[in-house]
C-alpha cells in the first residue's frame, strides 16, 4: 500500500493565469520494523488540470454526437485520463506533467514532488448553474506496472477576470516590487505581478462612484426614486442602494429587492420542444431585503454578494448576469392609507437596472 | 463428447495472440497510429477524432485481428521521463513498432538515441522491429533515405532480427496496413517468441 497526499500551498481558489502549486507526497506507511515490511514500487505519477463541462439535457441542446467522437478508451484504466468516469465532456486541460518515474519506497519512507502549472486564461470560470456546470480539478494519477491507474482528484475554483487575457508579462526587468521591503525571487514575480495587476484593475473598476437615479412608477403615477452609486462590484462587497419614497404620488406599502443572477443559454444552444418548452433562462437569488415602508420617506438597503458566487461571464453556450429585482406593493387609495384597503393591494413588479449592463459584472471596461 | 467438440471448435477458431509495443518520442504519432490501425482492421470499430488525441501517460491498449493472428498493441507514453518504463514490457512482447516524427528534424538525434537504447536491449533479441517514418503527409518532411542516414549508427545493433523502415502517415492511413501486415508475417514465423499461451479447455 502506498499513500498519496496532495497539498495546495495557498488554498483551492485561483485566478485564471495564475500558477497553481501543489506538493505531492508519496509514503510507504508501514513502519520500518513491521514484520511484513517490504518496499513498494510505483511506475509513474502524473498530474494534470482539467475543466469538465456538463449541460442539462432538458435545457441545452449540444451539437450532435457525430461531431464529437468518443474519447480514446474513455474508461481505460491503463492510460492517464483525468476525466475518467466523469459526466460531461472535458473542454480544457493542461498537458500532463510527470512527477516521477520508477519510484521505490522502503517501509516508512516518504518522498515529495512539486507540481506547478499556469491555469489557462481562455477557459470559463468555475460555475455550478441550473443549465450548465464548469468544474475544475487537479488530478494526480499513479500506476504500478501491470495495474490500473489510481486517480486522486483535488477540486479547484477558478475565477476569470475579464481583460487579463490580453496582458502579457513584461519582458524587461523594470518591474519593481511594490514594496521596497519585499524581496521576491524570479519565479514568484510573475504570479504576484498578475495578482497585483488584477487587484489594481478590480479596484479601478469597482471604485468608480457616480450616483445613478431611476424613477419608479406604476400605472398611476410616481412611486419613488431608486439611487445606486456603482454598477460594478467585487465578490464579497455589499450592493448599497437608496429609495426615496417621500415625493411619490402613489403610496408604497411594502417593497422587496433581491440580488439575483440570471443564467441564460445562448439562442443557438437552447433546447426547443413542441410542448413544454424548458426555460432557457433561470434565476438564482443570492440576497434579499424586504421592508414595510408606509410613511417612510427615505430608506436604504444593503445586499451582500456571496464570496462563493460566480462573477458574470459569457461563453459560447451560456451567459451569467447580475441584477437587482424589485417588487413594490402600492396602494390604490392615497387618501385612505390609514384604513385597510377594500381591495387586495396590487403588486407591481418592475425589474431594476441590471448589474454591469455595459458588460459583465467585474468587467474592466471604462465608463 | 461436448468437451471434445468444444475443444475442437476452440482449436479451429483460436487466434494466436502477439503483443506489439509501439514506442517512440512523444508527439511522434504512436497513439494516432494505433487509432488508425484499429479503424482499418476492425470493421465495427468506431474511431475517434484523430484531432482529439492528447499526450499519452500510461498505456493505450488496442487489439487488431489480421488473418489468424491477433495483435495486441501496447502504446506507451513517449515522454522522456516515461521511457525508462519501456523495458518493463520487452520480455513479453513479440514485436516493436518504433514511430519517428519525420517533420521534427531537431529531435531526430534524440529519437535515434532512444531507438539505440531499444535495439541494444537484450530482452528484445530476435524481436522484429518496424520503423515507421510518420507524418509523411507533410510536404516538408524528411525522406526515408534522410532518416536512414540519421539512424545509420544503429544498423550494427539490429543484428539478425527482422527490420523494416516504412514511410507512413498515421493521420491519412498511408503505409499503416503494409506495416502491420509485414509485422504479422514476422511475428508468426519467429519461432523464438511463440504466441501467448492460451488454455484450450
From Swiss-Prot, chain B:
InterPro entries linked to this entry: P-loop_NTPase, Small_GTP-bd, Small_GTPase_ARF, Small_GTPase_ARF/SAR
Intracellular or extracellular location(s): Golgi apparatus; Golgi apparatus, trans-Golgi network
Matches recorded under Pfam families: Arf
Entry keyword annotation includes Nucleotide-binding: yes
Name of this protein: ADP-ribosylation factor-related protein 1
Binding site for GTP: 24-31, 75-79, 134-137
Keyword terms: Acetylation, Golgi apparatus, GTP-binding, Nucleotide-binding
Gene Ontology terms describing biological process: gastrulation; Golgi to plasma membrane protein transport; intracellular protein transport; protein localization to Golgi apparatus; retrograde transport, endosome to Golgi
Record-level Gene Ontology MF annotations: GTP binding; GTPase activity
UniProt source species: Rattus norvegicus (Rat)
Tissue spec. comment: Found in most tissues.
NCBIfam families: small_GTP (TIGR00231)
Amino acid at each position: 500500500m502506498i499513500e498519496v497526499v496532495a497539498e495546495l500551498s495557498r488554498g483551492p481558489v485561483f485566478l485564471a493565469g495564475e500558477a497553481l502549486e501543489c506538493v505531492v507526497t508519496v509514503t510507504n506507511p508501514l513502519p520500518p520494523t513491521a514484520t511484513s515490511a517490504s518496499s513498494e514500487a510505483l511506475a509513474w505519477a502524473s498530474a494534470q488540470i482539467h475543466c469538465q463541462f456538463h449541460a442539462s439535457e432538458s435545457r441545452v441542446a449540444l451539437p450532435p454526437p457525430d461531431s464529437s467522437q468518443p474519447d480514446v478508451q474513455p474508461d481505460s484504466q491503463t492510460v492517464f485520463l483525468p476525466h475518467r468516469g466523469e459526466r460531461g465532456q472535458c473542454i480544457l486541460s493542461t498537458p500532463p506533467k510527470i512527477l516521477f518515474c520508477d519510484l521505490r519506497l522502503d517501509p516508512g519512507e516518504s518522498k515529495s514532488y512539486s507540481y506547478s502549472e499556469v491555469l489557462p486564461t481562455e477557459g470559463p470560470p468555475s460555475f455550478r448553474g441550473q443549465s450548465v456546470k464548469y468544474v475544475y480539478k487537479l488530478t494526480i494519477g499513479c500506476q504500478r506496472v501491470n495495474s490500473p491507474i489510481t486517480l486522486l482528484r483535488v477540486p479547484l475554483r477558478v475565477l476569470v477576470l475579464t481583460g487579463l487575457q490580453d496582458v502579457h508579462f513584461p519582458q524587461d526587468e523594470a518591474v519593481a516590487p511594490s514594496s521596497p521591503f519585499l524581496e521576491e525571487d524570479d519565479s514568484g514575480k510573475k504570479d504576484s505581478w498578475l495578482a497585483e495587476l488584477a487587484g489594481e484593475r478590480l479596484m479601478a473598476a469597482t471604485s468608480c462612484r457616480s450616483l445613478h437615479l431611476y424613477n419608479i412608477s406604476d400605472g398611476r403615477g410616481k412611486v419613488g426614486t431608486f439611487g445606486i452609486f456603482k454598477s460594478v462590484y467585487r465578490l464579497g462587497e455589499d450592493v448599497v442602494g437608496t429609495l426615496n419614497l417621500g415625493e411619490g404620488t402613489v403610496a408604497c406599502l411594502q417593497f422587496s429587492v433581491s440580488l439575483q443572477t440570471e443564467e441564460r443559454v445562448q439562442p443557438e444552444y437552447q433546447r426547443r420542444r413542441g410542448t413544454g418548452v424548458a426555460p432557457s433562462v433561470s434565476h438564482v437569488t443570492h440576497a434579499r431585503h424586504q421592508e414595510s415602508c408606509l410613511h417612510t420617506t427615505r430608506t436604504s438597503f444593503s445586499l451582500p454578494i456571496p464570496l462563493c458566487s460566480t462573477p458574470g461571464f459569457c461563453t459560447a453556450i451560456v451567459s451569467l448576469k447580475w441584477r437587482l429585482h424589485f417588487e413594490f406593493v402600492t396602494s390604490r387609495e392615497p387618501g385612505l392609507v390609514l384604513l385597510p384597503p377594500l381591495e387586495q393591494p396590487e403588486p407591481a413588479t418592475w425589474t431594476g437596472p441590471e448589474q454591469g449592463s455595459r458588460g459583465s459584472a467585474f468587467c474592466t471596461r471604462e465608463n | 463428447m461436448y468437451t471434445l467438440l468444444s475443444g475442437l471448435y476452440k482449436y479451429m477458431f483460436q487466434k494466436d495472440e502477439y503483443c506489439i509495443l509501439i514506442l517512440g518520442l512523444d508527439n511522434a504519432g504512436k497513439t494516432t497510429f494505433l487509432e488508425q490501425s484499429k479503424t482499418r482492421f476492425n470493421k465495427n470499430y468506431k474511431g475517434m477524432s484523430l484531432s482529439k488525441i492528447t499526450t499519452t501517460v500510461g498505456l493505450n491498449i488496442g487489439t487488431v485481428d489480421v488473418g489468424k493472428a491477433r495483435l495486441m498493441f501496447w502504446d506507451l507514453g513517449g515522454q522522456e521521463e516515461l521511457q525508462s518504463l519501456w523495458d518493463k514490457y520487452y520480455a513479453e512482447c513479440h514485436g516493436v513498432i518504433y514511430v519517428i516524427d519525420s517533420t521534427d528534424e531537431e529531435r531526430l538525434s534524440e529519437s535515434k538515441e532512444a531507438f539505440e537504447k531499444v535495439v541494444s536491449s537484450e530482452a528484445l533479441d530476435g524481436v522484429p522491429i518496424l520503423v515507421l517514418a510518420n507524418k509523411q503527409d507533410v510536404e516538408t518532411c524528411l525522406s526515408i533515405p534522410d532518416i536512414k542516414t540519421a539512424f545509420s549508427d544503429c544498423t550494427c545493433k539490429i543484428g539478425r532480427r527482422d527490420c523494416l523502415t516504412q514511410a507512413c502517415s498515421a493521420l491519412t492511413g498511408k503505409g499503416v496496413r503494409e506495416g502491420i501486415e509485414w509485422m504479422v508475417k514476422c511475428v508468426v514465423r519467429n519461432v523464438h517468441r511463440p504466441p501467448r499461451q492460451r488454455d484450450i479447455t
